[in-house]
Amino acid sequence: MNWKNLVCSVMLLVGITCAEAVNFTPDNVSASIALKVPGNDAKRYPLTLQQLDNSNFEYQWVAADKLPVVIYQNVEEKDGNQRIVIFMTALDDVYFNFGEQVMTGCHHDDCLFYMPGFWYRRNLRSPQEAPSFHTSDSWLVREDRLSTPLTAIFDEKNRKTYSVIRLDNMASDALTTHKEGEVILSGKTSIGYTGFENLSGIASLSFGFPYKEAPKTYIRKLTLAPSVEAYQLLRKGESLSLTWELHESEIADFSECVQHIWEYSYDTNCPQIVNTPYSPEKMKEVMSNFFVESFVGNTPTHYYSGVELRTATCDQTDVAEVGFVGRTLLNAFNALEYGEQQRRTDLVTNAYKIFDSYLQNGFSETGFFNEVVHYRRNFVESVHSIRRQSEGVYALLHFLNYERLQGRKHPEWEKRIKSMLDMFLRLQNKDGSFPRKFKDDFSIVPKIRKQSQWQSQLQ
C-alpha cells in the first residue's frame, strides 16, 4: 500500500473522504505515549485514533485511561507527500515520550534500510558490536546521529521506497544524568528519534519525540549499551507541535534509492552556506600546528604523534602508525604540499625526514610497511592489515606524483612501491578481494566472529 492510499485510509477512518482509500485497517498506523513520574518506572499507554467533528483538528489520539495530556493530529497534503503534524497540550505537569509507527505493507524480509550517515542496507558489514542486523532487525536512533533526520525503507520486491523525515527546527538539546534506561531531560530538547521496526513481519517507519534508542544505544566504537528513552517535561498549559513528512517513490534499486533520498532530503531541508568567523586559510594555518607540535624525530622512523593521544595534555605518544588513525605518510605529504605553498621550511624539512626515515627503517623483512610501531614498549605489530598497507601506498603515490610535477624523482621509493604492488597481487583473491589481515609470510589471519542470533535463525 502506498503512502497516498495509507493516509487517505486514515482520513476515511476519521470521516474525511478520499477516492483512493482502499484496504485500510487501524493496524496500519499506531501510536503510544509513555508518561513518567521521576523516581518511578514510566507507564506506556497505547493510543487509538478518534474522529473529531467541528474541530480545528482532523483527529485525536486517545488512550483507554484519562491522560494528563491531549494529542491531536492533522495530515496535510504537500507536493505529493503527506505531512503529519502533532499538537500536544498538557493538562497537568507531565514527563512524556511519544511515538508513532506507520506500516508500509512491505514484508520486512524483502526490505533494505537507509539512515543517512548511520545505516546502509542491513549493516551486515558492520561488526557484531555495532548497530546491525547481527543484533536486531529493528532499530531506533536519535535524530542527531544522522546526516539528516530521515529513515528510508526500500522494498526490493516491489521496487518502492518509503521514508519519513522530521521537519522541525533542531535548535536545542538538554543534558541527562544517565546514558541508559529511562532518563529525565534537564531542559528542552529538539531531538526526537527515527528508525524502522519489524511489526509482525511488516516493515514500519517509526518516529517520535523526545529521543530514544533501541534495542541498544551506540555509546562509542564497538560498544553497544542498553537502550535509552528520554522524557521531557511539558508543564500544565504548555503546548508542543511536531512535524514529520512521509514520502514514497518508485525506485529501481537500492543505489538509486540512496541517490533519490539524498536529493529529496537536500530539496526538503534547503541547506544554506554557514558563515563562519574564520576563513579556510586561517583554519589551515591553525591546523598546521599539528605538524609542528606532534612531530617526533628521535626514533628510527620519524612520525606525527596522534595515536592514543590524550586530549587533556596532547602529549606525544610512542606509537608510529602508517594509515588509519596515525596516517603518518599521508600527513607528511599534506605537510610537504602545504609547507611549500606557504614557504614553511619547518614543515617541508620534517616531512622529508619522515619519508626518508621510512624508506630506510619503515619496512618489514618481506617488504611490507611496519605499520604500527610502539617505540617505548619496543614492539612492532606483526600482523599486517590491507587497510594500513594500502593507505600507505596511497600516500606514497600522491607524494611521488607531486614530486614528479616539481621535477624531483625518488627511484628508491618507486622501486619499493612497485615491489609492494606486486606483493598485493600475491594476496589478492580470485574474486578480486583482499584479505583483511595477514602476516609477513603472506599467511592469512582468519576473521573470527561470533554468529549472531539473527544469522542462526536464517540457517
Where are these predicted regions, by residue range?
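Bacterial Sec-dependent N-terminal signal peptides
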Residues: 1-22
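Beta-strand/loop-rich accessory regions of lumenal/periplasmic or secreted enzymes
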Residues: 24-29, 36-41, 48-236
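Low-complexity, Ser/Thr/Pro/Gly-enriched N-terminal "stalk/linker" regions
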Residues: 25-30, 40, 234, 252-321, ...
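Short, solvent-exposed loop/edge-beta patches enriched in aromatic
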Residues: 53, 67, 77-80, 92, ...
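Solvent-exposed loop and edge beta-strand segments that line ligand/cofactor-binding
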Residues: 226-230, 310-329, 375-391, 437-453, ...
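Short Pro-Gly-centered flexible turn/kink motifs
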Residues: 231-255
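Well-ordered alpha-helical scaffold segments within catalytic/enzyme domains
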Residues: 329-345, 391-409, 453-459
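Helix-terminus loop motifs that line ligand-binding clefts
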Residues: 345-391, 412-438
